[in-house]
Amino acid sequence: MRPLAVVGPTGTGKSDLALGIAEALSGEIAVEVVNADAMQLYRGMDIGTAKLTVDERRGVPHHQLDVLEVTETATVARYQQAAAADVDAIAARGALPVIVGGSMLYVQSLLDEWSFPATDPQVRARWETRLAEVGVAALHRELAAVDAAAAASILPTDGRRIVRALEVVELTGRPFAASAPTIGAPRWNTAIVGLDWETTVLDERLRRRTDTMFERGLVEEVRGLIGRGLRDGVTAARALGYAQVLADLDAGGDGEAAREPTFVGTRRYVRRQRSWFRRDHRITWLDGAAPGNVDAVLRLWRQRRAGAPRPAD
């Protein structure tokens, strides 16, 4: 069974579209969803990631949700291996795997079957120590000195990716980008659709989404996760919303002041997602505001299933 992938920026309605597809195919083909949102991998990180509740999943099986504790580090390599096994198992039992998410590296690693550069714990630890000593901005400048292209593609505030880039450069002797695959035929011949909205409309959706998270108890969720080790999490503690609430609580606030930084950070992240996904010529884009998106996706998937080429844009 050839999979379907629903990708695109945060807040565009990808999960709802996937559920609509499952309902439209009910009685014809069973559908199972494979999550491709890195922060939804974490148990207890529900409100701030807009994770569907069990009831909201409408009986559709979901995979790669709630598989990590907040103290564990999420890695693209681990996700790729586990999610690929899920896709293969779903297809083997005659169901349709629908990959849903907007975590850029996670999506592409799965669809392009990335092979990952070697890692060395000692080299990684040395660069992490260097990060702690000089700070993220200085380490970003050090990366720029040895790999300008990598530095240009990594945010100066993203210490984890800066460390990884420096580790790869040291271990391989090549630029970080040289380890990344090119975009080719998608794994499993997956049909890929992207969902997006006009910018001003999406910004308003993101504003409402952020407000809803805080009204539903994001601050209380973060407080509860602190007791489970959130501050010690390398990746979980940096998640949008969680990082901002943590910072406000640590500064003596009640968490409410994190609302605006969370919205601004989410909007900035959406711009990065758009830039990333728009370069992928394999994606067929849909307007989130348009009617009939479920039917449009199913037409594309049926064409791909029958072996027809992707229609020209």
Curated annotation (Swiss-Prot):
Keywords of this entry: ATP-binding, Magnesium, Nucleotide-binding, Transferase, tRNA processing
Binding site for substrate: 10-15
Cofactor(s) it depends on: Mg(2+)
Entry annotated with the keyword Chaperone: no
Annotated GO biological process: tRNA modification
Family annotation (Pfam families): IPPT
EC number(s) on file: 2.5.1.75
Catalytic reactions on record: adenosine(37) in tRNA + dimethylallyl diphosphate = N(6)-dimethylallyladenosine(37) in tRNA + diphosphate
Binding residue positions for ATP: 8-15
Gene Ontology molecular functions: ATP binding; tRNA dimethylallyltransferase activity
Feature type site, description Interaction with substrate tRNA: 103, 124
Secretion signal span: none
Top-rank taxon: Bacteria
Assembly information from the UniProt record: Monomer.
Record family assignment: Belongs to the IPP transferase family.
Role this protein plays: Catalyzes the transfer of a dimethylallyl group onto the adenine at position 37 in tRNAs that read codons beginning with uridine, leading to the formation of N6-(dimethylallyl)adenosine (i(6)A).
Name of this chain's protein: tRNA dimethylallyltransferase
Organism encoding this protein: Mycolicibacterium gilvum (strain PYR-GCK) (Mycobacterium gilvum (strain PYR-GCK))
